[in-house]
UniProtKB/Swiss-Prot annotation:
Gene from which the chain derives: PUR1
Residues bound to [4Fe-4S] cluster: C253, C399, C450, C453
Pfam families: GATase_7, Pribosyltran
Protein name: Amidophosphoribosyltransferase, chloroplastic
Obligatory cofactor(s): Mg(2+); [4Fe-4S] cluster
Protein location: Plastid, Chloroplast
Length: 485
Protein backbone atom coordinates (compact mmCIF):
# COMPACT_ATOMS: atom_id res chain seq x y z
CA UNK A 1 0.00 0.00 0.00
CA UNK A 2 1.31 3.47 -0.88
CA UNK A 3 0.10 6.71 0.55
CA UNK A 4 0.34 10.25 -0.76
CA UNK A 5 1.90 11.49 2.45
CA UNK A 6 2.79 15.00 1.43
CA UNK A 7 -0.63 15.62 -0.08
CA UNK A 8 -2.24 14.53 3.15
CA UNK A 9 -0.11 16.42 5.64
CA UNK A 10 -1.41 19.78 4.50
CA UNK A 11 -4.71 18.88 2.86
CA UNK A 12 -5.82 16.28 5.42
CA UNK A 13 -7.78 19.06 7.08
CA UNK A 14 -9.92 19.66 4.01
CA UNK A 15 -12.94 17.71 2.84
CA UNK A 16 -11.87 16.09 -0.42
CA UNK A 17 -13.93 16.53 -3.55
CA UNK A 18 -15.18 13.31 -5.00
CA UNK A 19 -14.65 13.46 -8.78
CA UNK A 20 -14.99 15.41 -12.00
CA UNK A 21 -16.75 14.37 -15.21
CA UNK A 22 -16.68 15.46 -18.85
CA UNK A 23 -18.76 14.47 -21.86
CA UNK A 24 -18.28 15.58 -25.49
CA UNK A 25 -20.50 14.84 -28.49
CA UNK A 26 -19.82 15.75 -32.10
CA UNK A 27 -16.16 16.79 -32.27
CA UNK A 28 -13.53 14.87 -34.27
CA UNK A 29 -10.99 15.66 -31.51
CA UNK A 30 -13.31 14.52 -28.72
CA UNK A 31 -10.76 12.51 -26.72
CA UNK A 32 -8.08 15.22 -26.88
CA UNK A 33 -10.57 17.87 -25.83
CA UNK A 34 -11.74 15.55 -23.08
CA UNK A 35 -8.20 15.22 -21.73
CA UNK A 36 -7.79 19.00 -21.72
CA UNK A 37 -11.08 19.44 -19.89
CA UNK A 38 -9.96 16.86 -17.33
CA UNK A 39 -6.81 18.94 -16.75
CA UNK A 40 -9.09 21.84 -15.81
CA UNK A 41 -10.91 19.56 -13.35
CA UNK A 42 -7.76 18.05 -11.85
CA UNK A 43 -8.47 19.71 -8.49
CA UNK A 44 -11.58 17.50 -8.17
CA UNK A 45 -9.60 14.26 -8.17
CA UNK A 46 -5.95 13.25 -8.36
CA UNK A 47 -6.02 9.48 -7.82
CA UNK A 48 -6.88 8.41 -11.35
CA UNK A 49 -8.18 9.49 -14.74
CA UNK A 50 -9.88 7.83 -17.68
CA UNK A 51 -11.48 8.45 -21.06
CA UNK A 52 -13.83 6.30 -23.14
CA UNK A 53 -14.48 7.16 -26.80
CA UNK A 54 -16.79 5.62 -29.41
CA UNK A 55 -15.83 5.09 -33.05
CA UNK A 56 -17.76 2.96 -35.56
CA UNK A 57 -19.87 1.57 -32.70
CA UNK A 58 -16.76 0.32 -30.89
CA UNK A 59 -15.72 1.52 -27.42
CA UNK A 60 -12.09 2.50 -26.84
CA UNK A 61 -10.84 3.05 -23.30
CA UNK A 62 -7.73 4.35 -21.53
CA UNK A 63 -7.69 4.47 -17.72
CA UNK A 64 -4.81 4.97 -15.33
CA UNK A 65 -3.78 5.80 -11.78
CA UNK A 66 -2.37 9.27 -11.12
CA UNK A 67 -2.78 12.73 -12.57
CA UNK A 68 -4.22 13.41 -16.02
CA UNK A 69 -0.70 14.17 -17.28
CA UNK A 70 0.49 10.82 -15.91
CA UNK A 71 -2.23 8.87 -17.73
CA UNK A 72 -2.53 10.57 -21.12
CA UNK A 73 0.03 11.37 -23.78
CA UNK A 74 -0.25 11.57 -27.55
CA UNK A 75 0.21 7.83 -27.97
CA UNK A 76 -2.58 7.07 -25.51
CA UNK A 77 -4.92 9.66 -27.02
CA UNK A 78 -4.36 8.18 -30.48
CA UNK A 79 -5.94 5.00 -29.10
CA UNK A 80 -9.19 6.92 -28.55
CA UNK A 81 -10.66 7.74 -31.97
CA UNK A 82 -14.17 9.05 -32.48
CA UNK A 83 -16.27 12.18 -32.17
CA UNK A 84 -17.85 11.27 -28.81
CA UNK A 85 -16.11 10.71 -25.49
CA UNK A 86 -16.59 10.87 -21.74
CA UNK A 87 -13.90 11.36 -19.11
CA UNK A 88 -13.40 11.20 -15.37
CA UNK A 89 -10.93 12.28 -12.68
CA UNK A 90 -11.19 10.34 -9.47
CA UNK A 91 -10.87 10.83 -5.78
CA UNK A 92 -12.31 7.77 -4.06
CA UNK A 93 -15.18 8.26 -1.62
CA UNK A 94 -16.68 4.79 -2.08
CA UNK A 95 -14.24 2.09 -3.13
CA UNK A 96 -10.50 1.74 -2.86
CA UNK A 97 -7.93 3.66 -4.87
CA UNK A 98 -6.74 1.22 -7.51
CA UNK A 99 -6.87 0.88 -11.28
CA UNK A 100 -9.94 -1.34 -11.37
CA UNK A 101 -11.93 1.46 -9.72
CA UNK A 102 -10.83 4.18 -12.15
CA UNK A 103 -13.71 5.40 -14.29
CA UNK A 104 -15.31 5.58 -16.80
CA UNK A 105 -16.71 2.06 -16.50
CA UNK A 106 -17.82 0.19 -19.63
CA UNK A 107 -20.24 -2.72 -19.76
CA UNK A 108 -22.16 -4.69 -22.34
CA UNK A 109 -25.78 -5.69 -21.91
CA UNK A 110 -28.39 -7.39 -24.06
CA UNK A 111 -29.03 -4.46 -26.38
CA UNK A 112 -25.61 -2.82 -26.63
CA UNK A 113 -22.84 -1.26 -24.57
CA UNK A 114 -22.67 1.69 -22.21
CA UNK A 115 -19.96 3.71 -20.47
CA UNK A 116 -20.57 5.81 -17.36
CA UNK A 117 -18.70 8.44 -15.32
CA UNK A 118 -20.07 9.55 -11.96
CA UNK A 119 -19.55 12.53 -9.68
CA UNK A 120 -21.14 11.97 -6.28
CA UNK A 121 -22.00 9.15 -3.91
CA UNK A 122 -24.99 6.82 -3.51
CA UNK A 123 -26.09 6.68 0.12
CA UNK A 124 -27.92 3.37 -0.48
CA UNK A 125 -25.01 1.74 -2.31
CA UNK A 126 -24.56 -1.15 0.12
CA UNK A 127 -28.18 -2.25 0.09
CA UNK A 128 -28.40 -1.90 -3.71
CA UNK A 129 -25.25 -3.96 -4.20
CA UNK A 130 -26.42 -6.65 -1.78
CA UNK A 131 -29.76 -6.94 -3.57
CA UNK A 132 -28.10 -7.14 -6.99
CA UNK A 133 -25.64 -9.77 -5.77
CA UNK A 134 -28.50 -11.81 -4.31
CA UNK A 135 -30.04 -11.76 -7.78
CA UNK A 136 -26.85 -12.99 -9.44
CA UNK A 137 -24.91 -9.83 -10.34
CA UNK A 138 -21.13 -10.12 -10.21
CA UNK A 139 -19.19 -6.96 -9.35
CA UNK A 140 -15.70 -6.23 -10.64
CA UNK A 141 -14.94 -3.14 -8.53
CA UNK A 142 -15.56 -1.70 -5.08
CA UNK A 143 -16.90 1.57 -6.54
CA UNK A 144 -20.50 2.57 -5.91
CA UNK A 145 -20.76 3.67 -9.55
CA UNK A 146 -20.81 0.08 -10.78
CA UNK A 147 -24.31 -0.44 -9.37
CA UNK A 148 -25.64 1.94 -12.05
CA UNK A 149 -24.45 -0.37 -14.81
CA UNK A 150 -26.02 -3.39 -13.12
CA UNK A 151 -29.31 -1.55 -12.66
CA UNK A 152 -29.32 -0.59 -16.34
CA UNK A 153 -28.46 -4.14 -17.43
CA UNK A 154 -31.20 -5.72 -15.30
CA UNK A 155 -33.92 -3.24 -16.24
CA UNK A 156 -36.96 -4.75 -17.97
CA UNK A 157 -37.17 -1.85 -20.43
CA UNK A 158 -35.58 -2.03 -23.86
CA UNK A 159 -34.93 1.65 -24.78
CA UNK A 160 -31.73 2.87 -23.15
CA UNK A 161 -33.29 6.04 -21.77
CA UNK A 162 -36.03 4.05 -20.02
CA UNK A 163 -33.31 1.85 -18.52
CA UNK A 164 -31.57 4.98 -17.21
CA UNK A 165 -34.82 6.23 -15.68
CA UNK A 166 -35.46 2.81 -14.18
CA UNK A 167 -31.98 2.82 -12.64
CA UNK A 168 -32.36 6.34 -11.25
CA UNK A 169 -35.58 5.37 -9.48
CA UNK A 170 -33.44 3.12 -7.27
CA UNK A 171 -30.64 5.59 -6.57
CA UNK A 172 -30.48 7.77 -3.47
CA UNK A 173 -27.81 10.35 -2.78
CA UNK A 174 -25.71 12.55 -5.01
CA UNK A 175 -25.09 11.89 -8.66
CA UNK A 176 -24.09 13.85 -11.69
CA UNK A 177 -23.70 11.19 -14.38
CA UNK A 178 -22.60 11.12 -18.00
CA UNK A 179 -23.37 8.05 -20.12
CA UNK A 180 -22.02 7.14 -23.54
CA UNK A 181 -23.64 4.61 -25.86
CA UNK A 182 -22.93 3.73 -29.48
CA UNK A 183 -24.99 6.72 -30.63
CA UNK A 184 -25.89 8.90 -27.62
CA UNK A 185 -24.37 11.08 -24.94
CA UNK A 186 -26.60 11.35 -21.87
CA UNK A 187 -26.20 13.60 -18.81
CA UNK A 188 -28.21 13.04 -15.61
CA UNK A 189 -28.43 15.07 -12.42
CA UNK A 190 -30.15 14.27 -9.13
CA UNK A 191 -31.22 16.85 -6.55
CA UNK A 192 -28.38 19.05 -7.72
CA UNK A 193 -25.86 18.22 -4.96
CA UNK A 194 -22.98 18.18 -7.42
CA UNK A 195 -22.62 20.64 -10.31
CA UNK A 196 -23.02 19.72 -13.97
CA UNK A 197 -23.01 22.28 -16.78
CA UNK A 198 -23.59 22.22 -20.52
CA UNK A 199 -21.78 24.20 -23.21
CA UNK A 200 -21.16 24.23 -26.93
CA UNK A 201 -18.15 24.69 -29.18
CA UNK A 202 -18.22 26.79 -32.33
CA UNK A 203 -18.46 23.66 -34.48
CA UNK A 204 -21.67 22.67 -32.68
CA UNK A 205 -20.11 20.02 -30.42
CA UNK A 206 -21.97 19.68 -27.12
CA UNK A 207 -19.95 19.54 -23.91
CA UNK A 208 -20.91 18.56 -20.37
CA UNK A 209 -18.56 19.16 -17.44
CA UNK A 210 -18.52 19.41 -13.67
CA UNK A 211 -17.39 23.05 -13.81
CA UNK A 212 -17.37 25.91 -16.29
CA UNK A 213 -13.57 26.16 -16.03
CA UNK A 214 -13.42 23.00 -18.17
CA UNK A 215 -15.60 24.63 -20.81
CA UNK A 216 -13.37 27.70 -20.83
CA UNK A 217 -10.23 25.67 -21.44
CA UNK A 218 -11.59 23.98 -24.57
CA UNK A 219 -13.28 27.10 -25.98
CA UNK A 220 -16.81 25.93 -25.29
CA UNK A 221 -19.43 28.56 -24.50
CA UNK A 222 -21.38 27.99 -21.30
CA UNK A 223 -25.10 27.63 -22.03
CA UNK A 224 -26.72 26.46 -18.81
CA UNK A 225 -26.70 24.00 -15.94
CA UNK A 226 -28.18 20.56 -16.21
CA UNK A 227 -31.14 21.10 -13.91
CA UNK A 228 -31.80 19.03 -10.80
CA UNK A 229 -33.82 15.97 -11.78
CA UNK A 230 -33.05 16.41 -15.49
CA UNK A 231 -31.78 14.06 -18.20
CA UNK A 232 -30.22 15.67 -21.27
CA UNK A 233 -29.89 13.42 -24.33
CA UNK A 234 -27.63 14.30 -27.27
CA UNK A 235 -27.66 12.30 -30.51
CA UNK A 236 -27.73 12.85 -34.28
CA UNK A 237 -31.26 14.28 -34.07
CA UNK A 238 -30.23 17.05 -31.66
CA UNK A 239 -30.78 17.63 -27.94
CA UNK A 240 -33.70 16.52 -25.79
CA UNK A 241 -34.40 17.48 -22.20
CA UNK A 242 -36.24 14.95 -20.06
CA UNK A 243 -37.48 15.95 -16.60
CA UNK A 244 -37.40 12.99 -14.24
CA UNK A 245 -39.05 14.65 -11.28
CA UNK A 246 -41.38 17.60 -11.67
CA UNK A 247 -40.36 20.66 -9.64
CA UNK A 248 -37.40 18.90 -8.08
CA UNK A 249 -36.20 20.90 -5.08
CA UNK A 250 -32.44 21.40 -5.51
CA UNK A 251 -29.99 20.72 -2.69
CA UNK A 252 -26.73 22.16 -3.96
CA UNK A 253 -23.48 21.56 -2.08
CA UNK A 254 -22.44 24.85 -0.48
CA UNK A 255 -18.85 23.59 -0.22
CA UNK A 256 -18.48 23.96 -3.97
CA UNK A 257 -18.44 27.72 -3.32
CA UNK A 258 -16.41 27.49 -0.13
CA UNK A 259 -13.61 25.19 -1.26
CA UNK A 260 -14.08 22.64 -4.06
CA UNK A 261 -14.61 24.60 -7.28
CA UNK A 262 -11.98 26.74 -8.94
CA UNK A 263 -12.51 30.48 -8.38
CA UNK A 264 -12.93 31.10 -12.12
CA UNK A 265 -15.89 28.72 -12.35
CA UNK A 266 -19.56 29.57 -12.28
CA UNK A 267 -21.28 26.97 -10.09
CA UNK A 268 -25.04 26.77 -9.49
CA UNK A 269 -25.37 30.00 -11.45
CA UNK A 270 -23.03 31.94 -9.16
CA UNK A 271 -19.46 33.12 -9.57
CA UNK A 272 -17.28 31.16 -7.16
CA UNK A 273 -14.84 34.08 -6.98
CA UNK A 274 -17.57 36.53 -5.98
CA UNK A 275 -18.94 34.13 -3.36
CA UNK A 276 -15.57 33.74 -1.67
CA UNK A 277 -14.81 37.45 -1.84
CA UNK A 278 -18.12 38.19 -0.10
CA UNK A 279 -17.42 35.55 2.55
CA UNK A 280 -14.21 37.42 3.37
CA UNK A 281 -15.91 40.81 3.39
CA UNK A 282 -18.56 39.69 5.85
CA UNK A 283 -15.91 38.18 8.13
CA UNK A 284 -14.19 41.57 8.25
CA UNK A 285 -17.50 43.25 9.07
CA UNK A 286 -18.75 40.79 11.69
CA UNK A 287 -15.42 39.72 13.23
CA UNK A 288 -13.04 42.70 12.99
CA UNK A 289 -9.71 42.82 14.78
CA UNK A 290 -6.84 45.31 14.92
CA UNK A 291 -4.18 44.03 12.54
CA UNK A 292 -1.30 45.11 10.31
CA UNK A 293 -1.58 42.60 7.48
CA UNK A 294 -4.01 40.05 6.05
CA UNK A 295 -2.69 36.80 4.60
CA UNK A 296 -4.29 33.65 3.22
CA UNK A 297 -3.71 29.95 3.64
CA UNK A 298 -3.03 29.18 -0.02
CA UNK A 299 -4.58 28.41 -2.30
CA UNK A 300 -8.18 28.06 -1.18
CA UNK A 301 -8.17 30.96 1.28
CA UNK A 302 -6.83 33.58 -1.12
CA UNK A 303 -10.04 35.09 -2.52
CA UNK A 304 -11.73 35.31 0.89
CA UNK A 305 -8.57 36.95 2.26
CA UNK A 306 -8.68 39.53 -0.54
CA UNK A 307 -12.27 40.31 0.42
CA UNK A 308 -11.37 40.58 4.10
CA UNK A 309 -8.42 42.89 3.43
CA UNK A 310 -10.39 45.17 1.10
CA UNK A 311 -13.24 45.54 3.59
CA UNK A 312 -10.92 46.03 6.57
CA UNK A 313 -8.72 48.52 4.73
CA UNK A 314 -5.62 46.50 5.61
CA UNK A 315 -2.94 45.39 3.11
CA UNK A 316 -3.17 41.85 1.75
CA UNK A 317 0.21 40.21 1.35
CA UNK A 318 1.57 36.76 0.60
CA UNK A 319 2.71 35.71 4.02
CA UNK A 320 2.67 32.01 3.14
CA UNK A 321 4.09 30.60 -0.09
CA UNK A 322 2.81 27.20 -1.12
CA UNK A 323 5.02 24.64 -2.84
CA UNK A 324 3.21 22.74 -5.58
CA UNK A 325 6.04 20.31 -6.25
CA UNK A 326 5.99 17.85 -3.35
CA UNK A 327 2.39 16.66 -3.42
CA UNK A 328 2.94 13.63 -5.67
CA UNK A 329 5.73 12.07 -3.60
CA UNK A 330 4.57 8.62 -2.52
CA UNK A 331 6.18 7.14 0.59
CA UNK A 332 5.00 5.20 3.59
CA UNK A 333 3.74 7.64 6.22
CA UNK A 334 5.54 8.09 9.48
CA UNK A 335 4.83 10.55 12.24
CA UNK A 336 8.32 12.03 11.94
CA UNK A 337 7.69 12.89 8.27
CA UNK A 338 4.17 14.11 8.98
CA UNK A 339 5.56 16.59 11.49
CA UNK A 340 7.44 18.24 8.62
CA UNK A 341 4.38 18.23 6.39
CA UNK A 342 3.25 21.83 6.74
CA UNK A 343 6.84 23.09 6.43
CA UNK A 344 7.21 21.16 3.18
CA UNK A 345 4.04 22.67 1.75
CA UNK A 346 3.96 26.19 3.21
CA UNK A 347 6.90 28.58 3.48
CA UNK A 348 6.43 31.67 5.70
CA UNK A 349 7.68 35.04 4.45
CA UNK A 350 9.42 36.49 7.49
CA UNK A 351 9.54 40.01 6.05
CA UNK A 352 5.74 40.05 5.83
CA UNK A 353 5.07 38.46 9.23
CA UNK A 354 7.80 39.57 11.64
CA UNK A 355 6.53 41.92 14.34
CA UNK A 356 3.07 42.12 12.74
CA UNK A 357 -0.46 41.51 13.94
CA UNK A 358 -1.56 39.01 11.31
CA UNK A 359 -5.04 37.98 10.20
CA UNK A 360 -4.93 34.55 8.56
CA UNK A 361 -7.91 33.64 6.37
CA UNK A 362 -8.65 30.00 5.58
CA UNK A 363 -11.67 28.38 3.97
CA UNK A 364 -12.40 25.84 6.74
CA UNK A 365 -11.19 23.98 9.81
CA UNK A 366 -11.88 20.24 9.96
CA UNK A 367 -9.73 18.38 12.49
CA UNK A 368 -7.76 21.43 13.60
CA UNK A 369 -4.33 19.83 13.54
CA UNK A 370 -3.11 21.58 10.39
CA UNK A 371 -4.45 24.93 11.59
CA UNK A 372 -2.43 24.58 14.78
CA UNK A 373 0.72 23.87 12.76
CA UNK A 374 0.09 26.90 10.54
CA UNK A 375 -0.37 29.18 13.55
CA UNK A 376 2.86 27.86 15.05
CA UNK A 377 4.68 28.33 11.73
CA UNK A 378 3.58 31.97 11.51
CA UNK A 379 4.53 32.71 15.11
CA UNK A 380 7.93 31.09 14.61
CA UNK A 381 8.41 33.52 11.71
CA UNK A 382 8.08 36.39 14.19
CA UNK A 383 4.41 37.34 14.06
CA UNK A 384 3.33 39.39 17.06
CA UNK A 385 -0.28 38.15 16.97
CA UNK A 386 -2.12 35.58 14.83
CA UNK A 387 -5.87 35.93 14.30
CA UNK A 388 -7.61 33.11 12.41
CA UNK A 389 -10.68 33.92 10.31
CA UNK A 390 -12.54 31.00 8.73
CA UNK A 391 -14.68 31.68 5.66
CA UNK A 392 -17.35 29.09 6.48
CA UNK A 393 -19.37 27.97 9.49
CA UNK A 394 -18.06 25.28 11.87
CA UNK A 395 -18.21 21.78 10.33
CA UNK A 396 -20.03 19.52 12.77
CA UNK A 397 -21.22 16.59 10.62
CA UNK A 398 -19.89 14.27 7.92
CA UNK A 399 -20.95 14.42 4.28
CA UNK A 400 -22.54 11.38 2.61
CA UNK A 401 -23.01 12.91 -0.83
CA UNK A 402 -19.67 12.31 -2.50
CA UNK A 403 -17.27 14.26 -0.29
CA UNK A 404 -14.61 12.52 1.77
CA UNK A 405 -14.94 13.96 5.27
CA UNK A 406 -13.77 12.56 8.60
CA UNK A 407 -16.16 10.88 11.00
CA UNK A 408 -18.28 13.13 13.16
CA UNK A 409 -16.13 12.27 16.17
CA UNK A 410 -13.01 13.57 14.41
CA UNK A 411 -14.51 16.97 13.56
CA UNK A 412 -13.11 19.49 16.01
CA UNK A 413 -16.18 21.77 15.86
CA UNK A 414 -18.35 18.83 16.91
CA UNK A 415 -16.25 18.38 20.05
CA UNK A 416 -15.25 21.93 21.01
CA UNK A 417 -16.70 25.41 21.04
CA UNK A 418 -14.93 28.31 19.32
CA UNK A 419 -12.90 29.31 22.37
CA UNK A 420 -11.73 25.74 22.93
CA UNK A 421 -10.71 25.48 19.28
CA UNK A 422 -8.84 28.79 19.55
CA UNK A 423 -6.83 27.44 22.47
CA UNK A 424 -6.20 24.17 20.63
CA UNK A 425 -4.78 25.84 17.51
CA UNK A 426 -2.95 28.51 19.51
CA UNK A 427 -4.28 31.63 17.79
CA UNK A 428 -4.90 34.94 19.53
CA UNK A 429 -8.46 35.03 18.23
CA UNK A 430 -10.70 32.85 16.06
CA UNK A 431 -13.93 33.55 14.20
CA UNK A 432 -16.08 31.57 11.76
CA UNK A 433 -18.56 32.79 9.17
CA UNK A 434 -21.96 32.33 10.90
CA UNK A 435 -24.39 29.98 9.15
CA UNK A 436 -27.23 32.51 9.25
CA UNK A 437 -24.96 35.10 7.65
CA UNK A 438 -23.92 32.63 4.96
CA UNK A 439 -27.57 31.97 4.14
CA UNK A 440 -28.33 35.69 4.01
CA UNK A 441 -25.52 36.16 1.48
CA UNK A 442 -27.20 33.57 -0.75
CA UNK A 443 -30.47 35.53 -0.57
CA UNK A 444 -33.34 33.80 -2.41
CA UNK A 445 -31.09 30.86 -3.31
CA UNK A 446 -30.48 29.94 0.33
CA UNK A 447 -33.17 27.18 0.50
CA UNK A 448 -31.61 25.52 -2.56
CA UNK A 449 -28.36 24.59 -0.82
CA UNK A 450 -27.34 21.66 1.36
CA UNK A 451 -25.90 22.65 4.75
CA UNK A 452 -25.73 19.16 6.27
CA UNK A 453 -22.06 19.48 7.23
CA UNK A 454 -22.93 22.57 9.30
CA UNK A 455 -26.24 21.38 10.75
CA UNK A 456 -26.33 17.57 10.72
CA UNK A 457 -29.68 17.73 8.91
CA UNK A 458 -29.48 15.54 5.81
CA UNK A 459 -31.80 16.16 2.84
CA UNK A 460 -31.46 12.52 1.74
CA UNK A 461 -31.27 9.88 4.46
CA UNK A 462 -27.92 8.05 4.46
CA UNK A 463 -27.88 4.34 5.26
CA UNK A 464 -26.93 3.36 8.82
CA UNK A 465 -27.59 6.85 10.16
CA UNK A 466 -29.87 7.59 13.09
CA UNK A 467 -33.11 8.80 11.48
CA UNK A 468 -33.70 11.33 14.24
CA UNK A 469 -30.57 13.18 13.17
CA UNK A 470 -31.68 13.86 9.64
CA UNK A 471 -34.49 14.89 7.35
CA UNK A 472 -35.80 12.68 4.57
CA UNK A 473 -37.13 13.66 1.19
CA UNK A 474 -40.04 11.61 -0.07
CA UNK A 475 -41.73 11.27 -3.40
CA UNK A 476 -39.37 9.74 -5.92
CA UNK A 477 -41.96 8.92 -8.58
CA UNK A 478 -40.54 9.78 -11.97
CA UNK A 479 -42.57 11.80 -14.43
CA UNK A 480 -41.66 12.74 -17.97
CA UNK A 481 -41.60 16.07 -19.67
CA UNK A 482 -40.10 16.50 -23.14
CA UNK A 483 -38.48 19.61 -24.46
CA UNK A 484 -36.64 19.67 -27.76
CA UNK A 485 -34.34 22.53 -28.68
Amino acid sequence: KTTNTFASVNDDEKPREECGVVGIYGDPEASRLCSLALHALQHRGQEGAGIVAVHDNLFHQVNGVGLVSDVFNEAKLSELPGSCAIGHVRYSTAGHSKLVNVQPFVAGYRFGSVAVAHNGNFVNYRSLRAKLEDNGSIFNTTSDTEVVLHLIATSKHRPFLLRVVDACENLKGAYSLVFLTEDKLVAVRDFGFRPLVMGRRKNGAVVFASETCALDLIDATYEREVNPGEVVVVDHTGIQSLCLVTHQEPKQCIFEHIYFALPNSVVFGRSVYESRRKFGEILATESPVECDVVIAVPDSGVVAALGYAAKAGVPFQQGLIRSHHVGRTFIEPSQKIRDFGVKLKLFPVRGVLEGKRVVVVDDSIVRGTTSSKIVRLIKEAGAKEVHMRIACPPIVASCYYGVDTPSKEELISNRMDVEEIRKFIGSDSLAFLPLDTLKSLLEDDAPNYCYACFSGKYPVQPENLNPTASMSLTGTMFQWQFETY
